[in-house]
Design a protein with these regions (language model features):
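A short beta-loop-alpha structural element at the N-terminal edge
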Residues: 1-8, 152-169
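Active-site rim helix/loop that mediates acceptor-substrate recognition in acyltransferases
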Residues: 10-14, 19-48, 55-61, 181-209, ...
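Conserved beta-strand in the GNAT
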Residues: 43-45, 51-60, 70, 75, ...
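A conserved beta-turn-beta hairpin within the catalytic core of GNAT-like acetyltransferases
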Residues: 61-71, 81, 223-236, 246, ...
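Acyl-donor-binding surface of acyltransferase catalytic domains
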Residues: 62, 77-151, 296-303
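Conserved acetyl-CoA-binding loop-helix of GNAT-fold acetyltransferases
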Residues: 76, 82-95, 122, 238-241, ...
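Active-site/acyl-donor-binding loops of N-acyltransferases
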Residues: 123-142, 256-260, 265-304
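Extended hydrophobic-aromatic, low-complexity segments
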Residues: 178-179, 208, 215-217, 225-230, ...
């Protein structure tokens, strides 16, 4: 696969998603390929007049019981749109995932891309959920909003195997009911902790109640994104709380701890993303803390 070409087209096509697009380089592409879950098949480059103008990555989820495929990196450089390139890339991706035995295909787009929405609907994709990019100014973080003060927070120790295994177990338990979640292996969890593709400064925290570990969250700083956007922003990662312990202020406690951690690192803002079909209603938690929606994305699904 021609990684330099892939990087060039991605950067040219994704500039419209400036709220989250940080750019990518060849070295980062190679790091992404080291992930145990990376699928090396299904990557296609579209050319017009021998010039690369578009991409698509037809990813077959290895651990999905539903045999679900995803259309990733589906993009065309703006000046080459409306010339049939997106239609051809979509056709190639769908056929690739059919060939690999997938029963369901998902693809996403920004709300402002009415042309992409129309294309997906013409291909019998149906809207299944929205994703929200949310942001908060760290000078406005509240307190006494229902956080559980009996919860003890402790950091994950990256060099302790037991902590990695605890995180893996918690992640799979907490996210079992979340749509699109596929169980993580120990290797995938270890790789995300030790070799995250862009959060070079990352911390993960466990929440314990009555000496039992019941939840976790993570925070990180993407230095490349901050330089590109000229901001001082951190990110709240996944927040997971075991089902029997939800609605007890533990998630609120974890979010507030994460925000205070980022503020202590001199960040001014924090970002998080979540979906409207999350059964834990995480978006309500973030709104309670003070996050505001920056941008929305639409995920469509096609059953084969």
């Amino acid at each position: 696969m021609d990684e330099p070409v892939w990087v060039e087209v991605l950067d040219a096509a994704y500039k419209e998603y400036e709220s989250w697009w940080r750019g990518i380089n060849v070295e980062e592409m190679h790091e992404r390929e080291k992930s145990p879950s990376f699928d090396f098949e299904g990557r296609f480059i579209a050319e017009l007049d021998e010039k690369p103008v578009g991409l698509v990555y037809a990813h077959a989820e290895k651990l999905s019981e539903e045999k679900k495929g995803f259309i990733y990196d589906f993009c065309v450089i703006p000046e080459f749109r409306d010339r049939g390139v997106e239609e051809k890339l979509a056709e190639v991706a769908i056929n690739e995932l059919k060939k690999r035995g997938m029963n369901v295909i998902q693809s996403w787009t920004g709300c402002e891309r009415s042309d992409r929405v129309q294309l997906l609907e013409e291909l019998d994709f149906k809207l299944v959920y929205k994703t929200f990019d949310m942001e908060i100014n760290l000078s406005n973080v509240p307190s006494n909003i229902g956080e559980n003060t009996q919860v003890t927070i402790s950091p994950l120790r990256k060099n302790v195997e037991e902590d990695i295994r605890t995180l893996n177990w918690l992640t799979n338990e907490c996210y079992e009911e979340i749509p699109n979640y596929s169980p993580r292996t120990i290797e995938e969890t270890r790789n995300s902790v030790l070799n995250h593709s862009h959060l070079k400064e990352q911390e993960i925290f466990f929440a314990a109640l009555d000496q039992k570990t019941v939840g976790y969250t993570g925070v990180g700083i993407d230095e490349k994104y901050n330089i590109k956007q000229n901001v001082k922003s951190g990110r709240i990662g996944r927040i997971g709380v075991l089902k029997p312990y939800r609605r007890k202020g533990i998630g609120t406690r974890l979010v507030l701890h994460g925000l205070k951690t980022l503020e202590a690192k001199s960040m001014i803002k924090a970002m998080v993303d979540t979906e409207d079909n999350n059964p834990t209603k995480a978006v309500k938690l973030y709104e309670k803390v003070g996050f505001k929606v920056l941008q929305e994305y639409l995920t469509f699904e096609k059953r084969l």
